Amino acid sequence: MNKMTEPKFAVGDRVIYNPKRTGNGWLAGEHGTVIYVDNTEAAYTVEFDVPVAEGNTDYRARANEIEPKPWHGWFCKEENLEAEA
């Protein structure tokens, strides 16, 4: 497995959506849990603790470019962000 497709997170990891990302600003700062890891694309499906949109009962959102370091991608691990504080 090369560096591009090496999983950064595992199922069950707690993550926070990057509040600085503007593409999906409505998710800024939201917490969630990784529920699926696609090892082929290093993509993840995150189930958020709150609905991703008003009236939306599907709390899942898929994102690529996830990095474990705070805000070097769409998400970071909760524990990594807490360690930076």
Identify the residue ranges that each predicted region occupies.
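Mixed-charge, Lys/Arg-rich low-complexity intrinsically disordered regions
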Residues: 1-23
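Generic beta-strand structural signal
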Residues: 10, 37-39, 83
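Short beta-strand-centered aromatic/proline hotspots
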Residues: 27-37
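Intrinsically disordered, low-complexity, charged/polar segments
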Residues: 49-85
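Short aromatic-glycine-enriched beta-strand elements
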Residues: 41-45
